[in-house]
């Protein structure tokens, strides 16, 4: 067990990156944080008597060496009206790396300890300032990788997820109450009214939340997009076009890329993990063979493959074999490149006649960018997240912990419905309802062990 649950300690941490910058924020919290900090603040008398939610100007003092360390602005908060629910100090100082070290060292000498990662947010949760779902949303916001994931992560801050789960819990509590009354009075001819329709609605809501995580995960972790094809087909030119900068070497000599090159780009708020692979051909040596084997492995694992074909040349053997093996593969987009040159009609006709889904065939030029907009649109329609309707106002699950608990709750609801259908004893129904309520309570934080909280909050960034 870490120091996270030692709430009597006065803690301090840098809340901004440890880099040279115009300003930095050093935050602290604890019952004695204000009097302890006042010992190293020039305007200490005003600080000790000041009300909460006030701002104070002064200097950080090194009393041992009788000198000023920095000119600062101090934000003072008094319990319970603070993020942590405790007395808190936030120091806005100049963003000097040396200055930051000196100020934090003075905090530590004054009786503070360094905060654990996520400790400020944990104290906020324990003080019932925020629900656990909102605490996890803060973590996802901080580490969002794209505009889309950031916008989706903001949604849980409204408390909609908590309200949604609370409604399901209330439905199950009604079952518990009715069963408890029945078992207490043991009236043989009394029938309990089970809210079957409400349980079905709860099942549908849980399934919707589970599906929302699958969409969020794809958006957050990124879509794997692999560029494949024979040598000198234009894969590296297409790779550089996606990135809008040169990363792959573009050359008229075939086989310039012998190993894969990886980069990321964003399209409509979705992160793409892009791979430029070695050209498919009969390998001349061990190094080339390894590169081609890796290319084949990436193609199998990809969410989407763009197979680039040089439509200005005769079709190489490797293209014949690949097209024949993958002509019905829905995750492969065949791109005929170099249409700015003289088109080889036999190559074009063979590809068109072989690929079963004509909409998965695009003609482009990476040189003059003809057909590129069509390619972008096609990529977006081929990615499965486009087929799932998810809006910024929808309730989104962005935590794997929440997802695991929701799947457990969903399985329990299915079991409950099955038992209702089989007309099992009421006490068995009550047990299942109780299990589901506890499961949902773990998501919101109403039911949580110290070990679970410790493991969750230690993954937060320092100062949060």
Curated annotation (Swiss-Prot):
Compartment annotation: Cytoplasm
Enzyme class: hydrolase
Primary location: cytoplasm
Pfam families registered for this protein in UniProt: MMR_HSR1, MnmE_helical, TrmE_N
Annotated positions binding Mg(2+): 236, 257
UniProt xrefs under SUPFAM superfamilies: P-loop containing nucleoside triphosphate hydrolases (SSF52540)
Annotated ranges, domain TrmE-type G: 222-384
Binding site for GTP: 232-237, 251-257, 276-279
Protein name per the record: tRNA modification GTPase MnmE
Protein's organism: Borrelia garinii subsp. bavariensis (strain ATCC BAA-2496 / DSM 23469 / PBi)
């Amino acid at each position: 067990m870490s120091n996270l649950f030692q709430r009597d300690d006065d803690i301090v941490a840098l809340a901004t990156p440890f880099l040279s910058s115009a300003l930095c924020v050093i935050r602290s919290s604890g019952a004695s944080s204000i009097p302890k900090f006042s010992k190293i603040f020039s305007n200490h008398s005003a600080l000790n008597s000041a009300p909460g939610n006030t701002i104070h100007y002064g200097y950080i003092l090194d009393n041992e060496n009788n000198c000023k360390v920095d000119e600062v602005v101090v934000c003072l908060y008094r319990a319970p009206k603070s993020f942590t629910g405790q007395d808190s100090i936030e120091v806005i100082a100049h963003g000097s790396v040396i200055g930051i070290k000196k100020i934090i060292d003075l905090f530590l000498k004054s009786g503070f300890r360094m905060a654990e990662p996520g400790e400020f947010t944990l104290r906020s949760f324990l003080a019932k300032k925020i629900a656990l779902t909102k605490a996890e949303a803060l973590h996802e916001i901080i580490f969002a990788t794209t505009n889309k994931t950031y916008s989706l992560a903001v949604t849980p801050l409204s408390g909609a997820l908590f309200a949604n789960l609370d409604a399901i819990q209330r439905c199950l509590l009604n079952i518990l109450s009715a069963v408890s009354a029945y078992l207490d009075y043991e009236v043989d001819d009394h029938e309990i009214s089970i809210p079957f329709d409400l349980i079905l609605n709860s099942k549908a809501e849980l399934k919707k939340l589970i599906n929302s995580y699958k969409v969020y995960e794809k958006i957050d972790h990124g879509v794997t997009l692999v560029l494949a094809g024979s040598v000198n087909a234009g894969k590296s030119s297409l790779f550089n076009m996606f990135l809008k900068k040169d990363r792959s070497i573009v050359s008229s000599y075939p086989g310039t890329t012998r190993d894969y090159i990886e980069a990321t780009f964003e399209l409509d708020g979705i992160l793409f993990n892009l791979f430029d692979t070695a050209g498919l051909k009969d390998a001349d040596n061990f190094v080339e063979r390894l590169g081609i084997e890796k290319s084949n492995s990436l193609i199998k694992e990809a969410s989407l493959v763009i197979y680039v074909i040089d439509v200005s040349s005769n079709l190489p053997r490797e293209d014949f074999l690949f097209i024949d093996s993958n002509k019905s593969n829905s995750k492969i987009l065949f791109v005929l490149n170099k249409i700015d040159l003289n088109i080889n009609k036999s190559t074009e006709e063979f590809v068109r006649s072989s690929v079963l889904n004509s909409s998965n065939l695009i003609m482009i030029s990476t040189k003059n960018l003809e057909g590129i907009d069509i390619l972008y649109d096609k990529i977006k329609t081929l990615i499965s997240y486009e087929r799932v309707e998810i809006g910024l106002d929808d309730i989104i699950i962005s935590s794997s912990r929440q997802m695991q608990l929701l799947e457990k709750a969903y399985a329990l609801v299915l079991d409950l419905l099955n038992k209702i259908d089989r007309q099992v004893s009421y006490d068995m129904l009550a047990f299942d309802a109780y299990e589901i309520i506890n499961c949902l309570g773990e998501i919101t934080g109403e039911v949580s062990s110290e070990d679970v909280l410790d493991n969750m909050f230690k993954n937060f960034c320092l100062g949060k």
